[in-house]
Regions:
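Residues in well-ordered beta-strands of folded domains
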Residues: 73, 115-117, 140-142, 153, ...
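A broadly conserved detector of short glycine/acidic/proline-rich loop/turn motifs that flank catalytic sites
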Residues: 118-120, 156, 187
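A generic structural signal for well-ordered coil/turn residues at beta-strand boundaries
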Residues: 24, 110, 146-148
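Long, low-complexity intrinsically disordered regions enriched in small/polar
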Residues: 161-188
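Catalytic NTP-binding/metal-coordinating core of nucleotidyl cyclase/transferase enzymes
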Residues: 1-40
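Intrinsically disordered, low-complexity terminal regions enriched in charged/polar residues
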Residues: 129-166
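Catalytic beta-strand-to-alpha-helix segment of the class III nucleotidyl cyclase homology domain
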Residues: 35-139
């Protein structure tokens, strides 16, 4: 998982070395530098992660294959001697633990299910010239005392009927480590 994420971050122009990372046992919390454009996380990053996971899985037996839930949010955090804390971190983990996200991945033949906070969807997804808001499904999340609206996407296996029509906008990123090229496009 670490190698796939490192390659995906680097391929999208976000230096893995500059990201704060904390192993959380069965998962990983990664915080990108604040200067990293949030739009990359909905335009290129999901496609890069999915491609890296598929490449990993193609060379592994079924029991070693990886499918991933990914939560996206932005906000203020506090660093202390024990790591990172704050309401933004709490919300991100509530989104990640949401049964509806687990169900989205379980029902998908793909390798990635992604959830964004309501704020991230409204401010980043809707304002991106590449990300397709129609590829996201609005859901209600209620986990550990947190109730909120979130948006789920399955970047490598969209929900049926998720598309818009019109002109095409394309972005490309190349991973110097793996040599793979990732492309994201949106019909507008």
């Amino acid at each position: 998982m670490y190698r796939a994420l490192e390659n995906a971050f680097n391929a999208t122009g976000i230096s893995w070395a500059e990201c704060h990372r904390e192993d959380r046992g069965d998962g990983l919390m990664v915080m990108a530098p604040s200067r990293a454009p949030k739009s990359l996380f909905v335009e290129l990053f999901p496609h890069a992660v999915a491609a890296e996971l598929r490449a990993h899985n193609a060379t592994r037996p079924v029991e070693q294959q990886i499918r991933l839930r990914l939560a996206l949010h932005a906000g203020e955090v506090v660093f202390d001697a024990h790591g990172v804390a704050g309401a933004a971190v709490d919300l991100t983990f509530r989104l990640l633990d949401a049964p509806v996200l687990k169900q989205a991945l379980a029902e998908s033949p793909g390798v990635l299910a992604m959830v964004t906070s309501g704020w991230f969807f409204e401010e980043v997804v809707r304002n991106s010239p590449v990300a397709d808001p129609a590829a996201y499904s609005r859901v209600r999340v209620a986990v550990k005392g947190t109730t909120t609206i979130a948006w789920i996407s399955r970047p490598d296996r969209p929900y049926p009927g998720d598309h818009e029509s019109g002109a095409t906008v394309t972005m490309t990123a190349t991973s110097s480590d793996s040599g793979r090229v990732y492309q994201a496009a949106r019909d507008q």
